[in-house]
Amino acid sequence: MTHPTELPLSPLSALQFYATAPYPCSYLDGRIARSQVATPSHLINSDIYTELVKAGFRRSGVFTYRPYCDGCRACVPVRVPVAAFAPSRTQRRMWKRHRALVATVSPLHYDEDHYALYMRYQSARHAGGGMDRDSRDQYEQFLLQSRINSRLVEFRDPDAPDGEPGKLRMVSMIDILGDGLSSVYTFFEPDDPHTSYGTYNILWQIEQAKSLGLPYVYLGYWIRESPKMAYKANFHPLEGLIDGRWKVLDPARVDLPPVDAALARAPLPGGHTGSV
């Protein structure tokens, strides 16, 4: 286990960091991945999680991690600087197309309609990946467990004239950080072709961050070699965490080492050091 250097003035000094055993990469076929995990999870509050996200960490339920792969640095943490964001013509069109959707923000909670939509989405978009067989308990552990400031956002069509709720189109989980919003996971109606709900959701988060006076929207990891991640490169400007520093990226020209480059890992937040 990794034992970080004790820093009495740092709220991160009580955390420990360890590397997982190797496992098959879910983004690049034939690759082997590892993660670095921050523990214990009950000590990771919103303030501490903000610092971890700035250092490239993400969460899945109460599991806080970042890529820690041997000889690979393909995963680039990315964020959108809200004040500088300039939507493209296509993004403006998507915003106009879906702006009638009614967004309702609430604490994390279970809803049968949400779970049914999640299963339809997984079956259509990720069939055979395992998540298309998630039980209710697995769904709740993945998306509805959090020890930080998290919200569930439901997007529906406007209510019908008779007062019936509009059709559920999309559900998004977000974390509210000290310096921005962090997009956790989004799923939407897979039977609506060419809707670009995912793009609209990020645009909505950018507007929400702007209204809250928060400077960033964190989008997780961008991988140049992964088609699943391509949409993140459509938001400009886009900042990436490379060699421990956030800098503006040009996804078409970003100077990243190749996937098999020598191991290079970003420093731990708060000046922590450690060994595996």
Curated annotation (Swiss-Prot):
Superkingdom of source: Bacteria
Keywords, ordered alphabetically: Acyltransferase, Cytoplasm, Transferase
Chief localization: cytoplasm
GO terms for MF: arginyl-tRNA--protein transferase activity; leucyl-tRNA--protein transferase activity
GO BP term (any one): ubiquitin-dependent protein catabolic process via the N-end rule pathway
Keyword Cytoplasm belongs to the record: yes
HAMAP family: Bpt
Function: Functions in the N-end rule pathway of protein degradation where it conjugates Leu from its aminoacyl-tRNA to the N-termini of proteins containing an N-terminal aspartate or glutamate.
Similarity section: Belongs to the R-transferase family. Bpt subfamily.
Name of protein: Aspartate/glutamate leucyltransferase
Gene designation per UniProt: bpt
